[in-house]
Amino acid sequence: MKKTAIALVVAGLAAASVAQAAPQENTFYAGVKAGQASFHDGLRALAREKNVGYHRNSFTYGVFGGYQILNQNNLGLAVELGYDDFGRAKGREKGKTVAKHTNHGAHLSLKGSYEVLDGLDVYGKAGVALVRSDYKFYEDANGTRDHKKGRHTARASGLFAVGAEYAVLPELAVRLEYQWLTRVGKYRPQDKPNTAINYNPWIGSINAGISYRFGQGAAPVVAAPEVVSKTFSLNSDVTFAFGKANLKPQAQATLDSIYGEMSQVKSAKVAVAGYTDRIGSDAFNVKLSQERADSVANYFVAKGVAADAISATGYGKANPVTGATCDQVKGRKALIACLAPDRRVEIAVNGTK
């Protein structure tokens, strides 16, 4: 009992000290992120057509906020809103920037997460981003912008991400994420406005972020189920005829009352133990006690107790409760009456409340 109490205290302290990987349900969070973006698909073809070099990598950053809808059984679900500078690609000629493609916009996504370790989630996001793409061209090597050649588009793009998030504290989390944005913008040359060059790249980025979670407080501790143990003892002379294993009709009311109490115990495990007095051979007494235990167990199974949740064992004359009380009793009838407490069936029920 003392060891069990200590174990429950230790478990409670451990649960209180570990931050949940995902925020608590029905709470908000907000954060910032930064990293490196890389443009793919179409950039090389555009640079070749314009006869310029290109630079695909750039700095990216953003802000985000979310609402935690679900956090149960290691599974989390949140909705996230953010605004990003998605990065820029540059056309280069003789070491100078001659063209620039920049992107920024808002995005909305669903974020599903799974807790793999205490405080550590892996997650995936899927959503949509409304992206403004600006195409800037420069008329000379000094970087003077030609406003006549400037263009911009605003288009919806698919947004996807995978990452890992670790709760440093219940209120503070860090994340590492890879995000990709599909088919960004659609560049059209000014001299051919109805013709689209195949340039609407994908943008991949790797970001590190930090977020603050509002209204976390202490992580909820789930109380351990209360253990329930009950023991019932049946006088065999009331339950069975002497030397027999068949239940008497009047035993039904007693067994039904015990079954009513057993049914209040959750996840109950039932152990039925049969005992006899010391009269007779050991072999006969073990056999009789086993048959009596089986009769009681079968009655409970017929009432609804699962067969794999109940066991029956006959112990014969073992563990007498009369001790030496009847040692001086003379005569068979008197001895049988004195040893009546030893002829019993004990029922032990263990489960939770």
Curated annotation (Swiss-Prot):
Residues 1-21 form the signal peptide. Keywords: Cell outer membrane, Disulfide bond, Ion transport, Membrane, Porin, Signal, Transmembrane, Transmembrane beta strand, Transport. InterPro entries: Bact_OuterMem_StrucFunc, OMP/PagP_b-brl, OMP_bac, OmpA, OmpA-like, OMPA-like_CS, OmpA-like_sf, OmpA-like_TM_dom. It is found in: Cell outer membrane. Disulfide bonds join 326-338. The keyword Ion transport applies. It holds the Pfam family OmpA. It is a multi-pass membrane protein. The chain crosses the membrane at residues 27-37, 58-69, 77-85, 104-115, 120-128, 158-167, 172-179, 205-213. The keyword Mitochondrion does not apply. Residues 227-353 form the OmpA-like domain. GO terms for cellular component: cell outer membrane; pore complex. Its main location: membrane. One of its GO terms (biological process) is monoatomic ion transmembrane transport. The record marks 80, 175 as: Part of salt bridge gating mechanism. GO terms for molecular function: porin activity. HAMAP family: OmpA. Belongs to the outer membrane OOP (TC 1.B.6) superfamily. OmpA family. Non-typeable Haemophilus influenzae (NTHi) is a primary pathogen in otitis media (inflammation of the middle ear). With TolR probably plays a role in maintaining the position of the peptidoglycan cell wall in the periplasm. Acts as a porin with low permeability that allows slow penetration of small solutes; an internal gate slows down solute passage. Monomer and homodimer. PANTHER family: LIPOPROTEIN YIAD-RELATED (PTHR30329:SF21), STATOR ELEMENT OF FLAGELLAR MOTOR COMPLEX (PTHR30329). The extracellular loops are most variable in sequence, and in some bacteria confer sensitivity to phage and/or colicins. This is Outer membrane protein P5. It comes from Haemophilus influenzae. The gene is ompA.
